[in-house]
Amino acid sequence: MQPRVVILDYGSGNLRSAQRAVARVGAHATISSDPHTALEADGLVVPGVGAFAACMRGLRALRGDRVIGKRLAGGRPVLGICVGMQILFERGVENDVVTEGCAEWPGTVERLDAPVIPHMGWNTVDAPAESAMFAGIDKDTRFYFVHSYGVRTWEMQTTSPHLKPPLVTWSTHGTPFVAAVENGPLWATQFHPEKSGDAGAQLLANWVATL
């Protein structure tokens, strides 16, 4: 049976392209803004484009932040894409305005420190060797990015021997920034896997395989 995946419609993101990309790798993908439907799906994709603050307003308007929290509390997979990854952090800072995020991870989304903004186009990533997200993907593969803001410092410290620390993948545009995170049922990418060709399809297939 195909796993059921909901692409969360909260007024932001490349909904149709994400839906098509997830469907192509074997899931039954639908677009929905209904919190109950999003909560009950086998997998939830949280897309996002544009401003951090606008995305958080849209997400909170349909209680999407609570849906994400409830899913993760129950170990149910969530995949954040682009600003859908950024809003998983504690806060975003745009034009000196601070907006609270979902706070699944500590850290601040801020403007990239680079001579050319936005970061638009193809770039390589440095993924941990044990990454399940990047399984079957060559190390020098490029993914498609389009963003002006990102997480430049990973602040989460895990010292307990009983807790598995998140796997953090980095990329560089001017200075390093977080390109992807794997944290149990919560995966997220700053780049767009749905626009990243065969490599993006492999990544999405790896995620669907966890459902």
Curated annotation (Swiss-Prot):
Catalysed reaction(s) here are:
5-[(5-phospho-1-deoxy-D-ribulos-1-ylimino)methylamino]-1-(5-phospho-beta-D-ribosyl)imidazole-4-carboxamide + L-glutamine = D-erythro-1-(imidazol-4-yl)glycerol 3-phosphate + 5-amino-1-(5-phospho-beta-D-ribosyl)imidazole-4-carboxamide + L-glutamate + H(+); L-glutamine + H2O = L-glutamate + NH4(+)
Q: Where is this gene product found?
A: Cytoplasm
From the UniProt record, give the pathway where this protein acts.
Amino-acid biosynthesis; L-histidine biosynthesis; L-histidine from 5-phospho-alpha-D-ribose 1-diphosphate: step 5/9
The record's EC number reads 4.3.2.10, 3.5.1.2
For this UniProt record, the keywords arranged alphabetically read as follows: Amino-acid biosynthesis, Cytoplasm, Glutamine amidotransferase, Histidine biosynthesis, Hydrolase, Lyase
Q: Which GO BP annotation is one of this protein's?
A: L-histidine biosynthetic process
Can you supply one Gene Ontology CC term for this chain's record?
Answer: cytoplasm
| Presence of keyword Mitochondrion | no
Which segments constitute the Glutamine amidotransferase type-1 domain? 4-211
Taxonomically, which superkingdom?
Bacteria
CDD domains on file: GATase1_IGP_Synthase
Q: What Pfam families does the entry give?
A: GATase
Q: What is its main location?
A: cytoplasm
Q: How does it assemble?
A: Heterodimer of HisH and HisF.
Protein name from the UniProt record? Imidazole glycerol phosphate synthase subunit HisH
